[in-house]
Amino acid sequence: MIRPGRCLWQPCLSGRKRSRPSGPVSRHGMMAAMTAPTAAAIRPVQALLVVDVQAAFVSGWEAVPDADRVLRCTRDLLSRARAAGALVVHLQNDGEPGAVDAPHTPGWELHLPVEPGPRERVVRKTEDDGFADTPLGDLLTDAGVTELAVCGVLSEMCVAATARTALVRGHRVVLPHDAHATYDIPAAPGISDTVPAAMSSRAAEWALGDEVEIVPHAAAVPFAAAPRPAVGPAAAPGLPVSPAAPPPSPVR
């Protein structure tokens, strides 16, 4: 089974490692540490990256199992980010021809409306990593953004790849546990039974290491105004205005 579209995970080693316990830890304690989202005082963030919230992944029969929850949490994040004057960037994946998210097909369309203005942008991409061959890095730099939140789909693919690169670039990254999702991992004979989507999402969080701030609920993420407006033309509703990413390579 291949997940819809071309949002394929490309691991990137950032050098960040999960710290080991300094003393003996019971099996129960270790499992609790691995399954409970990190809770800490949360400082406001200046930007929201909405990753691949496109029709193919959050609506219809191919939607991720937790699409309703992700959409509800993303709407809340968007509303509060806009009200605070934070930079909002919608990442839109350009799938390969024939994929459910191939450009200009119904599944490719952004599911949530884009509001025109100096602090909202759409960035198209052809890789998991929203920074790869896109203007995302320049947008954040030009707006003076140092702290950001990430939400969307798929947890272990485009969400993780984008969050990881943001960390490598020196950004503070907040990842709300209830604002990202993925698909079940199908059973593999001799390897594992089906892995539920929720477990896959949690494993994706854990794999990002210690520096990402994972919070249980999107509602707890506060926003502040971006220091400067984004440079370049403002987004019209539903229309990407960033330079289109290059066409996908036919060979992967």
Swiss-Prot record:
How does activity shift as pH rises or falls?
A: Optimum pH is 7.0.
Activity as a function of temperature: Optimum temperature is 55 degrees Celsius.
Keyword vocabulary terms for this entry: Antibiotic resistance, Hydrolase
User: What EC identifiers does the entry list?
Assistant: 3.5.2.19
Question: Which parts of the chain are coiled coil?
Answer: none
Q: Which residues form the active site?
A: 158
Which parts of this chain are annotated as the region Disordered? 230-252
Record GO terms (molecular function): hydrolase activity, acting on carbon-nitrogen (but not peptide) bonds, in cyclic amides
Q: Where is the composition biased (Low complexity)?
A: 230-242
Q: Do you know which SUPFAM superfamilies this protein is assigned to?
A: Isochorismatase-like hydrolases
Q: Name one Pfam family in it.
A: Isochorismatase
Give the catalysed reaction(s), semicolon-separated.
streptothricin F + H2O = streptothricin F acid
Q: Which PANTHER family match?
A: ISOCHORISMATASE HYDROLASE (PTHR43540:SF1), PEROXYUREIDOACRYLATE/UREIDOACRYLATE AMIDOHYDROLASE-RELATED (PTHR43540)
Instruction: Give the family this protein belongs to, as stated in its UniProt record.
Output: Belongs to the isochorismatase family.
Name of the molecule in the record: Streptothricin hydrolase
Q: Which organism is it from?
A: Streptomyces noursei (Streptomyces albulus)
